[in-house]
Amino acid sequence: MSGARSTTAGAVPSAATTSTTSTTSNSKDSDSNESLYPLALLMDELKHDDIANRVEAMKKLDTIALALGPERTRNELIPFLTEVAQDDEDEVFAVLAEQLGKFVPYIGGPQYATILLPVLEILASAEETLVREKAVDSLNNVAQELSQEQLFSDFVPLIEHLATADWFSSKVSACGLFKSVIVRIKDDSLRKNILALYLQLAQDDTPMVKRAVGKNLPILIDLLTQNLGLSTDEDWDYISNIFQKIINDNQDSVKFLAVDCLISILKFFNAKGDESHTQDLLNSAVKLIGDEAWRVRYMAADRFSDLASQFSSNQAYIDELVQPFLNLCEDNEGDVREAVAKQVSGFAKFLNDPSIILNKILPAVQNLSMDESETVRSALASKITNIVLLLNKDQVINNFLPILLNMLRDEFPDVRLNIIASLKVVNDVIGIELLSDSLLPAITELAKDVNWRVRMAIIEYIPILAEQLGMQFFDQQLSDLCLSWLWDTVYSIREAAVNNLKRLTEIFGSDWCRDEIISRLLKFDLQLLENFVSRFTILSALTTLVPVVSLDVVTEQLLPFISHLADDGVPNIRFNVAKSYAVIVKVLIKDEAKYDALIKNTILPSLQTLCQDEDVDVKYFAKKSLAECQELLKN
């Protein structure tokens, strides 16, 4: 599709020509030139050697169309764009395809929408995947604007042209357009013809076309599910044949798409209350789960809970899925085990018999928790704790807790992090006491991990844990740890630790913050405060806490400490004090009557002093904060 840019359409003068009018030209010629200008300008820009310029020009199509008006857009711009669509680079085509999907208002409304179809059909046949995808999206957008008559007279023939073209690219695009017509066709014979055409595509020789068929089939089935009274048995004969083509294809890149197709088919029959096909569909599910191609097994594993949910009305069907599920847990491909590890709790909830969970599922979980692949163990850790909701307290303590505690000691940090992040449900069932002995060492070890990103991750989990574990446990076991992060060697960790204190205050309240955090920060060793970084960190922490503590705490504890740093020897400290003052005034102004004197007699004079500072940065931030404070007082 790409190539040298065309210099045809020479009948329209260039921008340079149209922008210059002879002094001898009459008014009529001048008006004519001005009316040609937008299109001529676009043409000039689309002849530019630099592709970036041509792409930018194409992004302005809507502006050009507005300038031209609907009639000239239809008669001049669209024919010109049809030429461009056959003679430029893929980057330009992609923008053109996307723009045309929003073009119906610019050509005069839906009654003229079919004029956009030929150029989009050209783009939908492009070699470049991105161009085709943009064109298909735009065609589907335009189709929504079409009347029934336009749909039948123009859009359906367009699908037929693409579906019967010689090139696979056109056929792939055709597959993405059926969704715009499948439920708008009320005539059974016409819909049958459409499905027959889709079946024809499913029998194509090229895997690319068959993949497009498999990818789009669930969308078509879901549309029929939303319109249950529309489809006939004959429609489903076609759909069944298409599904069989996909599930029996010899290419795993086609066959794995059968999993989503099967789920959609099951949803349709479940919505209809029709169980006559369920056993056959279960057989198809088992076939896919045990397929020799690992990609097919992976897809079945990844969708296992969704698949199982479609059989949940009959426990006998669920029971038939237990062994295939266990086989996936022992699959020789790590990616398959990783996918199914995330599905354990989701599948187990469909098992009515706790003994199956205890005797079959938990042993599989035990094996997965010790899997040689750390990504499998991490995947299991991210989802497994919900299984406790299916067991009583004694069963959790005796059968599941040992697995969980072992995972809290896993050598891979992500496993421990994922378990810690999802402990609330376990805590709700068995209480924190049984977890604490293993939980605290895991948290402490993660908090000291040499990888700062691991330390960052555990900091981000702390507020979640705080909500789960409660204030008393937190104060006894974790508050020291939270303060210790303020002195980390990595700035990002110190910053995260400061924000962490704010989130904890939002959970536990201002009084807790005053007693457990602020009082300890203000009692730090004077020798420690000789370090600039320590002073800066405490200043940053106290400033961050200003919006989440009571005004009394702000005025009695935070403000005095911050103010005494106003004459600090380090300019960086002084200008951060200036910024802190603005934060403090912003909260004190909520009770201006009470704190007006404090603001005017303490904060503003200090800011005015800082405005005279010898350091330019201090002066800049002091003046900025002073202006903010004065504006707050004025309002």
From Swiss-Prot:
GO molecular function: protein phosphatase regulator activity
Annotated Pfam families: HEAT, PPP2R1A-like_HEAT
GO process annotations (BP): meiotic sister chromatid cohesion, centromeric; mitotic spindle assembly checkpoint signaling; regulation of translation; spindle assembly
Superkingdom, natural source: Eukaryota
A GO CC annotation given for this chain: cytosol
PROSITE patterns for this protein: HEAT_REPEAT
UniProt keywords, alphabetically: Repeat
Biased composition (Low complexity): 1-27
Location of region: Disordered: 1-33
First and last residues of every HEAT repeat: 34-72, 73-111, 112-150, 151-189, 190-228, 229-273, 274-316, 317-356, 357-395, 396-434, 435-473, 474-512, 513-553, 554-598, 599-632
Function: Phosphatase 2A affects a variety of biological processes in the cell such as transcription, cell cycle progression and cellular morphogenesis, and provides an initial identification of critical substrates for this phosphatase. The regulatory subunit may direct the catalytic subunit to distinct, albeit overlapping, subsets of substrates.
Written domain comment of the UniProt record: Each HEAT repeat appears to consist of two alpha helices joined by a hydrophilic region, the intrarepeat loop. The repeat units may be arranged laterally to form a rod-like structure.
Family statement: Belongs to the phosphatase 2A regulatory subunit A family.
Note, other: Present with 16900 molecules/cell in log phase SD medium.
Assembly, per entry: PP2A exists in several trimeric forms, all of which consist of a core composed of a catalytic subunit associated with a 65 kDa regulatory subunit (PR65) (subunit A). The core complex associates with a third, variable subunit (subunit B), which confers distinct properties to the holoenzyme.
Protein name: Protein phosphatase PP2A regulatory subunit A
Native source species: Saccharomyces cerevisiae (strain ATCC 204508 / S288c)
